[in-house]
């Protein structure tokens, strides 16, 4: 009987150890891993977008690269996590790269994902091989106010309250009205709106407010890797402002789309893929 009790205790202890030490590390995103190549690409979608935004892009590179496609926690139906913030997400992606021993990946980000790509390359300059920023700026708020300075303690509670107070129809209508200003391809409109509608409202409000407070204009001077900056066609009219924002990024190569809006991968696909191919293969 004594021997039996000892065996039971040993079994329970082993089970406890397996439960504690066998748990996978948590990251503020879901990952879909595809492709099979020695070199890797990490795709970071934009605000409230699904990793599916990269589906067509991935197809062009999966034969030669291992692709890691993220969807951030709380966006597009992915389970939210407590305390979302731009800095936490940046560090989470960097930790994922280190923990999985992904050697010098190419990091491609759209919109807020482009901001994250800049921040990762700036704060972890030895971690990435190249970055591609798809229609993002170092400081979104400075586009309308060049003297903008980010707040050290940024209170996002009002924005969160505003977003969570909307009913389903109000939120859907808001997204339906906003999206045509960001996406010219009507065939993709409902899909992109649906990603927003499926997003967690608290995360939506918190990250909208937090990202608008981000200022990377000085930090990007730390970036050492080659950097391709793809911008929507309208931004050519604001080129002096764009150049000023990016003046500290010495490795930047700027390309302006010929047509379309913020979702360049949908609105000027052939041009977009050509730029990616040329940059990645160089």
Predicted regions and their residues:
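Bacterial Sec-dependent N-terminal signal peptides
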Residues: 1-28, 282
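Conserved HGGG/HGGXW glycine-rich cap/lid loop of the alpha/beta-hydrolase fold
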Residues: 33-79
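Active-site loop/oxyanion-hole signature of alpha/beta-hydrolase fold enzymes
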Residues: 68-108, 112
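Conserved hydrolase catalytic core segment
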Residues: 103-143
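Flexible "cap/lid" loop of the alpha/beta hydrolase fold
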Residues: 131-166
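Hydrophobic, aromatic-rich cap/lid helix
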Residues: 190-218
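Conserved loop-alpha-helix segment in the C-terminal half of the alpha/beta-hydrolase fold
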Residues: 226-261, 266
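Post-His helix in hydrolase/transferase enzymes
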Residues: 266-280
């Amino acid at each position: 009987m004594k021997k039996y009790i000892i065996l039971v205790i040993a079994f329970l202890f082993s089970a406890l150890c397996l439960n504690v030490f066998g748990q996978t590390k948590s990251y503020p995103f879901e990952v879909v891993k595809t492709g099979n190549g020695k070199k890797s690409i990490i795709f970071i979608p934009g605000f409230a977008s699904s990793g599916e935004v990269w589906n067509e892009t991935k197809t062009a590179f999966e034969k030669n690269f291992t692709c890691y496609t993220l969807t951030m926690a709380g966006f597009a139906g992915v389970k939210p996590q407590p305390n979302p913030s731009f800095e936490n997400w940046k560090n989470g992606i960097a930790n994922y790269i280190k923990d999985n021993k992904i050697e010098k990946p190419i990091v491609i980000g759209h919109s807020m994902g482009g901001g994250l790509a800049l921040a990762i390359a700036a704060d972890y300059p030895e971690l990435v091989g190249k970055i591609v920023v798809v229609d993002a700026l170092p400081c979104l708020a400075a586009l309308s106010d060049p003297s903008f300075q980010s707040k050290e303690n940024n209170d996002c509670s009002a924005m969160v309250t505003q977003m969570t107070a909307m009913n389903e129809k109000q939120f859907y209508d808001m997204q339906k009205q906003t999206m045509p200003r960001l996406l010219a391809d009507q065939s993709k409109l409902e899909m992109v709106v649906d990603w927003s509608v499926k997003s967690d409202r608290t995360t939506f409000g918190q990250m909208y407010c937090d990202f608008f407070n981000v200022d990377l204009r000085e930090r990007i001077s730390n970036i050492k890797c080659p950097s391709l900056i793809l911008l929507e066609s309208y931004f050519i009219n604001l080129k002096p402002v764009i150049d000023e924002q990016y003046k500290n990024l010495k490795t930047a190569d700027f390309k302006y789309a010929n047509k379309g809006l913020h979702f360049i991968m949908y609105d000027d696909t052939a041009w977009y893929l050509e730029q990616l191919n040329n940059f990645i293969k160089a």
